[in-house]
């Protein structure tokens, strides 16, 4: 893609947008960087690119921003029904999403993971499996390292393992992974995608350009994910925690097996997998399937599963103070993710929840408390909504507390906990009402826990 001298507008100046600006500048494009937020809000983000030859635009979108523009590249956070997208379409300006743009530069094969929950763990785990073969691998995408950096650095013999979100899949055109995987699909981001059916179909786009000789790995146990198999033109490889499969990854006699064309091979005993929880077994099956289909040996897969310690902000053990354990699950940004965190812990729980309202319902989340959640500390925009749902299911009013900050929530949680309890931050909501992202929320939680020792 020749971009020298072309006028390119990057819409959205988060992590991906900043990366796009840097790469486009290095390709000698004339870059316009635009965000609807004002400069003061973005000042910190812009430090990296303020010395480059970039023309900045901030605030409410104006049609003249697109004057003479050859290409618009969208960051994932920019909705496809925004004014900038509509105007670019009216003016017939080429419009590419960040992932689609990056894909067009890729020399290395991309192994793409999506799903509502477990994406980051599965992507990181698969990345470790590739790394343990001794080959050069880049772990990128929605996981924090922008895909555009990975494709620019990766050579032909390297591998790219990418976590891909629904926001990123919404704008693909030719994007075609070597192997794709959908871990699960439960309601999320309905504020953006409007209906669950639309969200499901966007997730299914991950394999829409794959050919007959390529694979998509799908969760056999999740009816919504498995229903997408009929849309696939490529081969479908299932994984299951509950059923024995003639062809696929499955559990038999307490061990993971993978069978390809009827030839089954034992991978590992479940008790040897380092990361705990049923949801992590699902992640292990998904990552192992992609790795095995990529030609990685059962030994390498097993050794990785024995040593991989999980990811930051996902049921991450933080500390134990006076017999009370603290877990950071800031990555629990929807009810289903937080249900899995509650199920993974075996002790009584003091739960810190609440945050930005994405339009989620909290009925199943509250039902999962099931005698395990002894106190509920609520923060953020959804605090009252979760409280009202808890009341509906007769959760004791006296066991619900409110906190104005996360630091206050941590103090209240510690005061409410006894020896043998766990304090779990698993908000079931996004972080954007109080924090820049879930990582910042998780770091503030860990800092607040450390303060308890002072």
Curated annotation (Swiss-Prot):
It is found in: Cytoplasm. The gene is murD. Its EC number is 6.3.2.9. The keyword ATP-binding applies. This is UDP-N-acetylmuramoylalanine--D-glutamate ligase. Pathway: Cell wall biogenesis; peptidoglycan biosynthesis. Keywords: ATP-binding, Cell cycle, Cell division, Cell shape, Cell wall biogenesis/degradation, Cytoplasm, Ligase, Nucleotide-binding, Peptidoglycan synthesis. Belongs to the MurCDEF family. HAMAP family: MurD. It catalyses: UDP-N-acetyl-alpha-D-muramoyl-L-alanine + D-glutamate + ATP = UDP-N-acetyl-alpha-D-muramoyl-L-alanyl-D-glutamate + ADP + phosphate + H(+).
